[in-house]
Amino acid sequence: MSVQIFGDQVTEERAENARLSAFVGAIAVGDLVKSTLGPKGMDKLLQSASSNTCMVTNDGATILKSIPLDNPAAKVLVNISKVQDDEVGDGTTSVTVLSAELLREAEKLIDQSKIHPQTIIEGYRLASAAALDALTKAAVDNSHDKTMFREDLIHIAKTTLSSKILSQDKDHFAELATNAILRLKGSTNLEHIQIIKILGGKLSDSFLDEGFILAKKFGNNQPKRIENAKILIANTTLDTDKVKIFGTKFKVDSTAKLAQLEKAEREKMKNKIAKISKFGINTFINRQLIYDYPEQLFTDLGINSIEHADFEGVERLALVTGGEVVSTFDEPSKCKLGECDVIEEIMLGEQPFLKFSGCKAGEACTIVLRGATDQTLDEAERSLHDALSVLSQTTKETRTVLGGGCAEMVMSKAVDTEAQNIDGKKSLAVEAFARALRQLPTILADNAGFDSSELVSKLRSSIYNGISTSGLDLNNGTIADMRQLGIVESYKLKRAVVSSASEAAEVLLRVDNIIRARPRTANRQHM
């Protein structure tokens, strides 16, 4: 006798149906993004149904968070790609694909070999530990030599950018990214690096400027250059140069009384500007509008004013100049002013910008991106952000490993060796983990248009015979020494990919029941 315990709008999937639903959803997500993997990967064109805007990208996290998904298992993979993006900045596609391949192998073990999911989980845990141990042993640390470490950073940036829209100019952008990160002196705070996108020109025209650039200009009749700048950054209303008494009615019997009211408003504004001038500043930056009258008052007092600076720009400017955003002006002694050596108005393309040089935070810099279309600039910014994120993490975790499928095959070898020391059905799960790892170089070769069966078997033979620096040369379709080619990746990135993918697979393997409830509606009763 079956008993209905769920409401009418609740659906349930049990046992094999639930597990199959989870596997199918996760594998479908992996198949969706795997064609973007590697230096020869393809892009996806995403079009929004609501705004009708288009986006061209091959960034795994961007693709997955832009598409609505209904399958709960698919959403788990979307979440791990987001975490990978937040933690390391790159490897989002790799972690999604590896999770999907682990689940594909698990499905075969459950369906064909009738192995219990808990046995597979135990095997995957042993395999993951063996893989990460092999990865650690293969890692190289050149942080003791500044020249070699800089070379490592450039190689990592090139490897990251080789699968992006910037691949044709990866040498140029790798230098830009490395120089910007080295200015941070070990910090991972990318807020000090401003990225500005300007339409026009080509990607190779992009450059790094050692200063902070704000997309604004000084007020009318104000000097275009300020030296030894003392900067007050504010978020306050300076637009009351008109009568603005909202929600109030008043009667006057002559225009003179109306003039008195306007005069009182102007006196109030004049007093506010006088308070601001007591801070001893020569530059005032406001997040809100500055109307003509207060701007003229600033000019008369020898203070340059900048209005309507965007929120992100104001926050970042406060950070790099050492100031803070204020909204009241009663206690000048308690306010931190921003400082820089020079502020000057410059032209980039056909737009005016303000350049802040010699900022208090000496690591501040700006990367100016040029490109023909908005889509190109947006994807270039995403690509560059990935490279900057990976490089900033590498300055903390300085170890590196080899790319081109080398690290995956080294881990696969270690996992296969581990499988020989394990009895029972768990060894089958460990071997399945090794096969999933080998799928990454297989997909790299497939995406490049080469015979993956031949290439990957050659790579496997080379690695298993002790040549631990071998990898896929996807430009020539051969096996080559990755160290000589400079195909280097961050150790932290590879470690995060393997550990996150195995954890995600474990989470979904434990599922034996999926319960879906529709969102509550206004007329739906609360239990």
UniProtKB/Swiss-Prot annotation:
CDD domains from the entry?
TCP1_beta
Q: Does the keyword Acetylation apply?
A: yes
Q: Which Pfam families match?
A: Cpn60_TCP1
N-acetylserine-modified residues are S2
List, in alphabetical order, the GO biological process terms annotated in this UniProt record. Answer: chaperone mediated protein folding independent of cofactor; protein folding
Record keywords, A-Z: Acetylation, ATP-binding, Chaperone, Cytoplasm, Nucleotide-binding
* Domain of life assignment: Eukaryota
Q: What is this protein called?
A: T-complex protein 1 subunit beta
Lineage of origin: Eukaryota, Fungi, Dikarya, Ascomycota, Saccharomycotina
